[in-house]
């Protein structure tokens, strides 16, 4: 299958200045970018007068696990029976027929990273996937992209009558399973191919092996400054990879975050603060952190903010002082890097997935319409 987009103004998320060119996609991949391209048998799209952006990317949310008009029956992103559930997998709960996914695609969002919420100290794995499809296995780029953990008010609130009444307890529970997972890994590695020497199988600890081996990061929900730095401290203690999600108080600890040198996903920022740890949320935060040298993505945390409004979150960050090109990258290339899938998505480059959002105006404008979205070279209808 061939797709030829002709005459559009290309915003590729690599070069700061846009340029006019044609894009040829073959079998879902970008095959060529240049002037006066031709391809026999290709579907030709006249993009004259349109801006061509890479498909937008969400670094952190819960779309597909909780969507429109679903209530309890369709809310599957928090498991309230145990605060430590690393064995849970987002791919086992995502509903590809959730209407909010299709709506997100029509809004130019082509890739999302979705997973468990923040009720649990350790919630399970996130999945990175395309926003169209019928079977999550076929939609996935990474079926297990990160291991969710959470700090702050949410674990305390959800388990205050059972097992957690303080931030100290939250941290202790996380450290406990990391200690046990490290020992489990040691025994598995020592056993090698000798099955008789393997430790007794433990589903929770087995699920932690990719974290302990550095294959996936801990994806830490943290709003308040002390919670953010606790996540950094624990990740450093155990030598595991880390990404920070929300980072509401990030502007208060800029130097510390620069030193930590971990990817940050900032948001959601629309709406008034609904709890104490959100009191410092501001559209200035993404720009402050970005200017300091932090790796910043902007997120909706869907369904907190509708997924289709991701580009408007970037627009508000620009209004708060963020460089426009950096804000554009914060919803394309940077979240792809945050997730670990920038070899596939996040920019318009030869060899990457043919995911595009064609718009009749500037990405950040409320007056701009998404005229067409393409995922793997196919139109989203």
Per-segment meaning from a language model:
Residues 69-94, 132-135, 149-158, 197-198, ...:
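Active-site gating loops and adjacent loop-to-helix segments of metal-dependent hydrolytic enzymes
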Residues 100, 105-242:
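Polyanionic/metal-chelating signatures
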Residues 90, 185-282, 297, 337-339, ...:
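Active-site core of metal-dependent hydrolases
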Residues 6-12, 337, 349-381:
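C-terminal cap of metal-dependent C-N hydrolases
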Residues 8, 23, 28, 49, ...:
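Divalent metal-coordination and catalytic microenvironments
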Residues 68-69, 75-80, 85, 217, ...:
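His/Asp/Glu-enriched, well-ordered alpha-helical/loop segment
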Residues 1-3, 10-55:
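Histidine-rich, glycine-flanked metal-binding segment
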């Amino acid at each position: 299958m061939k797709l030829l987009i002709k005459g559009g103004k290309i915003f590729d998320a690599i070069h700061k200045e846009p340029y006019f060119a044609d894009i040829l996609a073959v079998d879902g991949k970008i095959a060529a970018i240049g002037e006066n391209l031709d391809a026999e048998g290709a579907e030709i799209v006249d993009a004259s007068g349109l801006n061509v952006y890479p498909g937008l990317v969400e670094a952190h949310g819960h779309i597909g696990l909780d969507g429109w008009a679903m209530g309890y029956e369709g809310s599957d992103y928090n498991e309230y029976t145990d605060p430590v559930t690393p064995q849970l997998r987002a791919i086992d709960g995502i509903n590809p027929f959730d209407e909010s996914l299709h709506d997100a695609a029509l809004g130019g969002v082509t890739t999302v990273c979705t997973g468990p919420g923040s009720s649990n100290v350790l919630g399970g794995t996130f999945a990175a996937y395309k926003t169209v499809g019928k079977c999550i296995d076929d939609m996935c780029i990474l079926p297990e992209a990160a291991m969710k953990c959470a700090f702050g008010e949410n674990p305390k609130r959800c388990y205050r009558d059972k097992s957690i009444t303080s931030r100290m307890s939250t941290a202790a529970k996380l450290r406990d399973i990391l200690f046990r997972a490290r020992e489990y890994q040691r025994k598995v590695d020592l056993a090698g191919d000798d099955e008789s020497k393997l430790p007794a199988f433990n589903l929770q600890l087995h699920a932690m092996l990719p974290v302990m081996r550095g294959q996936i990061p801990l994806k830490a929900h943290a709003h308040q400054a002390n919670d953010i730095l606790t996540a950094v401290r624990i990740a450093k203690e155990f030598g595991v990879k880390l990404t920070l999600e929300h980072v509401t108080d990030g502007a208060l600890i800029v130097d510390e975050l620069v030193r930590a040198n971990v990817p940050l996903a900032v948001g959601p920022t629309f709406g008034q603060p609904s709890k104490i740890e959100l009191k410092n949320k501001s559209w200035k935060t993404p720009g402050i952190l970005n200017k300091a040298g932090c790796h910043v993505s902007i997120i909706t945390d869907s369904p907190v903010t509708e997924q289709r409004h991701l580009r408007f979150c970037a627009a508000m960050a620009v209004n708060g002082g963020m460089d426009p090109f950096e804000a554009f990258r914060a919803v394309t290339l940077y979240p792809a890097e945050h997730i670990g899938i920038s070899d596939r998505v996040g920019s318009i480059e030869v060899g990457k997935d043919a995911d595009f959002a064609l718009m009749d105006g500037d990405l950040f404008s409320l007056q701009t319409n998404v005229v067409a979205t393409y995922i793997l070279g196919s139109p989203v209808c």
